Amino acid sequence: HKQKIVSRTSKEYPSCIPPFGTDALRFTFCSLASGSRDINFDLKRVEGYRNFCNKLWNASRFIMLQCTQKNLSKVSSKSKEDIWIQIELDKALGSSSEHIENYRFDLATQVIYEFVWEVYCDWYIEFCKVRLQNKTLSKIEKSQILTSLVWTLESILVALHPIIPFITEEIWQQ
């Protein structure tokens, strides 16, 4: 049986496994950690989670380029978009925590992945880009938008840190 695995692995990956990064591999293994005993390991999945890590990195770069300590607000925003993202974040973190408590790491990673990629990056950050270009925006309103972006990113980093510690730590330190 072992020879069969070695032979098949050598045939499928003659030059070893492509380097996708430790965090992408960790995220993949967490996403595969279901109640089933069989794991269908696919390098396309690792590549997809590498893309997720890149998406998180690029989102953090955008936010860091927009922010300084001086332009962050101590007052939370009352805008519909900022309230919406906090509600969505609370739902995602609550659901993810519940899945982790039940040892369903596959479902926990799915919830976080979908929130970060589809809600935070694809919708909220894009909303904020448009809002921040508004010439009539007051300094306080701009500060509240940036604070909401940062606060949500920080919450995401804390939630993801046990799964992908290297990229989250690097982003956090910056």
Where are these regions (language model features)?
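Intrinsically disordered, low-complexity acidic Ser/Thr-rich regulatory segments
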Residues: 1-25
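Helix-rich, typically C-terminal accessory recognition domains appended to large enzymatic cores
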Residues: 16-174
